[in-house]
């Protein structure tokens, strides 16, 4: 499972870890993504989305129907 939110588009960010002696090594920060199932009444079925915690708040605010319409408008298959 890739660390990519289907709602917000959030992806891993990259940077450096800095030790006490100031050695810099590459690292990445993964978003908190979860696989969640949502029932979509207009489709009459359950869909599984990979969403970040911010994406869950967006679904709570806008509703699953609006979010599914946005995802389909981007051309993603659900």
Curated annotation (Swiss-Prot):
Coiled coil: none annotated. It comes from Corynebacterium efficiens (strain DSM 44549 / YS-314 / AJ 12310 / JCM 11189 / NBRC 100395). This is Large ribosomal subunit protein bL28. Keywords: Ribonucleoprotein, Ribosomal protein. The keyword Ribosomal protein applies. Residues 1-29 are annotated as: Disordered. One of its GO terms (molecular function) is structural constituent of ribosome. Pfam families: Ribosomal_L28. HAMAP family: Ribosomal_bL28. One of its GO terms (biological process) is translation. PANTHER family: 39S RIBOSOMAL PROTEIN L28, MITOCHONDRIAL, LARGE RIBOSOMAL SUBUNIT PROTEIN BL28M. Belongs to the bacterial ribosomal protein bL28 family. GO terms for cellular component: ribonucleoprotein complex; ribosome.
């Amino acid at each position: 499972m890739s660390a990519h939110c289907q709602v917000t588009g959030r992806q891993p960010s990259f940077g450096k870890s800095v030790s006490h002696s100031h050695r810099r090594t590459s690292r990445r920060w993964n978003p908190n993504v979860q696989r969640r199932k949502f029932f979509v009444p207009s489709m009459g079925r359950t869909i599984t989305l990979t969403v970040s915690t911010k994406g869950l708040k967006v679904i709570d605010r806008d509703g699953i129907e609006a979010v599914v319409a946005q995802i389909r408008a981007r051309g993603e298959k659900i």
